Amino acid sequence: MHSHNVAKPAMYGRHWATAGAVSLLSLVFVLNGCAVGPDFVKPEADIHENWSEKDDSRVATKTAVDSQWWRAFNDPTFDKLIKLAYQQNLPLQITGLRILEARARLGIAIGRQFPQQQDIFGSATKVGVSENGANKAFLNQDFSDYQVGFDAVWELDFWGKFRRDVQAAHASLIASEADYDDALVSLTAEVALTYTVIRTLEERIELTRENVKLQEEGLKIAESRFSNGITTELDVTQARALLESTRASIPTLQSGLRQAQNALSTLLGQPPGAIQTLLDGQNGIPTAPEEVAISVPAELLRRRPDIRSAELSAAAQCARIGIAKADLYPAFSLFGEIGFQSSNNGGVQSNNAHFDNLFDASSFFYSFGPQVQWQFFNYGRIENNVRVQDARFQQLIVNYKNTVLRAAQESEDALIGFLKAQEATAFVQNSVHAAHRSVEIALVQYREGAVDYQRVLDTQRALLQEEIRLTDTRSSIATNLIALYKALGGGWELRQGQPVISESMQAEMRKRTYWGRLLPPPSPKPENLSPVPVRDIPVLKKPYW
């Protein structure tokens, strides 16, 4: 409860307080560029100028990655799935909401630049005084006290603490935007990979069924020769064993296919089975182009969202070192209080004071002036907090460098995988042609009695094995190209000009909470991807209401 039973300050005291407050406030604005703590400098990254496979004729260099790289596969179903995933994927929507959360946190940081305490207060108190208490002769035994007013305390940003807080919050905001882009890159790649798995399993099931027909033909030949007494029953049992083994692989493949379809449904924000009509038709394994155009390795530093996020997270933590260091210095504040008070607790002569004269001119009071607070004796708490923040910053610097190295590795691995899968596919295709011919020859020779049935079994097994290898290597071409585009940071441009939160979700949120101008959140812009230097942050930044 506020109590104001002291005399009003003398004139010279008011002048001193006013002059001190104005001088202190003026000094803070003059020292706008003053901020303790280190300024963030982008870490050096060890990355080569060119790819290891730069001399391969299938690799072309260009300044940017295709923003819609999946269209290179010329598969309309592919395009539809990517679009639906962008619109409906639930984890991506969560990442978009984190951008909104980060914008609100930036608003909190900006709000701290203004008076940190601004309270309207009021009270009406009835007090009964003990007749046996001290000073009872000077107080009414029963008295009332009424007061209402406004007070404020403004800690001035003398050491840049609040500007560093804004700087950290802004870096965290654009880091959350980079995280959204990274989630979008991962989503497009995951949809593409899952779709490729589905088409690969469909083809393997079809190949297995064709081999079942071929093995059924071999079984009929063995049964005919056995019934005519030409061979023993062993040929029949061997043929039947291979046939049943091949048939048994189909349910396993079908199970894997259904699981992949369910995984794709989840990526599209749909329950299992809901996207089956989209997958109808035999589009086959996505066919990748023979050549690929990619940017130089240094472009990774700009394009890969996870690298941008790592850099911005380090920038935010660098600003937090300054916030911690500011606590080592005295905090300068301005305080002020105005209000009205009416009380009859000053003795027997004050019985006429009551609520009716609360707002009389004689009931007005005020106080204001500068103040200083310094946590001088803190037993190492503040200094160790600075050390904690610095250690976290160094961790993020190392994490940034590791992210760059990992990005380079992923790109190189995917590129070499794509090129070598193409070469392997050409060899396996020749092997499949030879395996088909071997089966034909073995069956003819078996009918003629030139070879036993074991030779037929061996050629049929080899054919199935080589056809599966061909399917897998063709799939590997597509999956390695998808991995390459993901490693290069391709696909996040899909969100440009689009809201990161759907209109229906915005409407749902507005029903619960007043969001002001934070909704709808603007789409992140490429020119807003760098941390803001503290010197560019004003002492008073326009607040988010």
Report residues per predicted region.
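Terminal intrinsically disordered/low-complexity segments used for targeting and assembly
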Residues: 2-3, 19-21, 29-87, 146, ...
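Bacterial N-terminal signal peptides that target proteins for export
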Residues: 3-23
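Amphipathic alpha-helical coiled-coil segments
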Residues: 95-109, 183, 187-210, 214-217, ...
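Short, conserved phosphate-binding/catalytic loop or strand-edge motifs used
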Residues: 126, 218, 233-240
